[in-house]
């Protein structure tokens, strides 16, 4: 069945392009992983897929399995070597079941000593050349969305984040219709398999009025398609000088929070521009074996495997100052989706 093993689906939407929606998707995915959840990213921005570049796997190719496509692995389930756990502790893999809690957002599930796996699927992996333009009409886009949602073998996945194109286009309509069809298909099955939960949408905006006005249209889209709005993230909310620490409001200030208050949706928080994150995704790339091209380690066996974890994108991301901001977003969202938020 489509999406067997996927527990929760979260859409990431934006009204305008260039607001950092794909980078927000990736950072949410990485912080979900660091909360011990297994995560998948489905990139349905068909004409401008960004996820392969952001994860440093532009040259990766999709593997065809008997039951469908296998998504590209960004990193496996692992325990970072810096955690200092011994072999027996590593062997005791925790249960990934989403336990509900009676705590509020402020006491949402804490970080674990384990990092969940991250896999991704994008049209960018299927193009013959990464510079090829995708010039498709609506029916072909709809067919591709349907295939992404029915033919990808995600396996056990706690969260599937769907990175969408800006606005409300053919991709969004096809996505909403296909997810509804999948829900109906599961309801007709006599087996014990449960349908993936469409947890809701995270909306991304920048502070300017021209961006927040288009996000209002996204909220209206969610209302009409009955997709819950989990919250709004204001991205690029100022620039922090690396020398003096002064914050300059390059793109106005507070527009996302004001819009959230006026529309009655949750404001998750604001994220200033993180130069370190940009340098990380621009200057880091894996080779065809999945290893960091800059990693010259020659160790073999278990030690080499553990050392390689420190070179993973998720481990490098923890050094970016925006990690702490997105960690709070992840805890809030996990609390909302898994039932630990009583608000």
From Swiss-Prot:
SUPFAM superfamilies: P-loop containing nucleoside triphosphate hydrolases (SSF52540). Its cofactor is [4Fe-4S] cluster. Keywords: 4Fe-4S, ATP-binding, Cytoplasm, Iron, Iron-sulfur, Metal-binding, Nucleotide-binding. The keyword Ubl conjugation does not apply. One of its GO terms (cellular component) is cytosol. Coiled coil: none annotated. Signal peptide: none annotated. [4Fe-4S] cluster binds at residues 241, 244. Residues 80-91, 99-110 have a biased composition (Polar residues). Binds 4 [4Fe-4S] clusters per heterotetramer. Contains two stable clusters in the N-termini of NBP35 and two labile, bridging clusters between subunits of the NBP35-CFD1 heterotetramer. GO terms for biological process: iron-sulfur cluster assembly. PANTHER family: CYTOSOLIC FE-S CLUSTER ASSEMBLY FACTOR NUBP2, NUCLEOTIDE-BINDING PROTEIN NBP35 YEAST -RELATED. Belongs to the Mrp/NBP35 ATP-binding proteins family. NUBP2/CFD1 subfamily. Component of the cytosolic iron-sulfur (Fe/S) protein assembly (CIA) machinery. Required for maturation of extramitochondrial Fe-S proteins. The NBP35-CFD1 heterotetramer forms a Fe-S scaffold complex, mediating the de novo assembly of an Fe-S cluster and its transfer to target apoproteins. HAMAP family: Mrp_NBP35 (MF_02040), NUBP2 (MF_03039). Heterotetramer of 2 NBP35 and 2 CFD1 chains. This is Cytosolic Fe-S cluster assembly factor CFD1. It comes from Coccidioides immitis (strain RS) (Valley fever fungus). The lineage of its organism: Eukaryota, Fungi, Dikarya, Ascomycota, Pezizomycotina.
